[in-house]
Amino acid sequence: VQIAIWGQSNAVGTALRAELAAAPLSADPDLADYDANTLTFDRVRMWNGSAYVQLVMGSNNYGSAADKFGVEFGLAVRWMRETTEGTLYLIKQASGGVSITSFDPAPAALNWSNGNYEWGEAATWLAGQGVTLAARHWVWIQGESDEAQTQAWYQDRLQEILDALHSGGRMADPASRAVLSQMHPSTSTYGAGVAAAKTAIAGATPSRFSDIQFPGY
């Protein structure tokens, strides 16, 4: 299974790794062990631009700094816990402080071009290794820079991205799913229009799209 993680700073990863050993996350001691590589992500690979390599926190998870992490960590932990076989292939395209417009597919904006290119390179590498993916999924973590925008403005642009991913073959498989992450309402960069847009898209096609809110603690 392949999961592409696209978006801005929270997609890059801004959570402190030290928090994995502090309350409330310390209630799950495996988290700190996975972070320290005491427990290893034997069946999780991260794309590094030329190959898929085993995920190691602080080394190749591509957080915003070596002491930070993003959603890749939670996905990897759940994969190791909830599956007994198979490999999870992760790939990121994220930049801090960018608008959704930096992912515009037509004309192709920078993050769209880079993300689509890397996704293609990763696909070529997997094919060369004889790997056949059971499914390809997409996680969208963006909206903070567009918090002041209306639902209509944001929804049109997000739908364009989803349509382009589908028509371009990245998510054409019926098994593909897109997760649209929601900022917690208590955060300073929460945008009601952005949140409503994601909820509307997920509600229109729940078999393909879902919106999930970040936890707050």
What does each of the following model-derived ranges do?
Residues 1-217:
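Cell-envelope and extracellular/periplasmic
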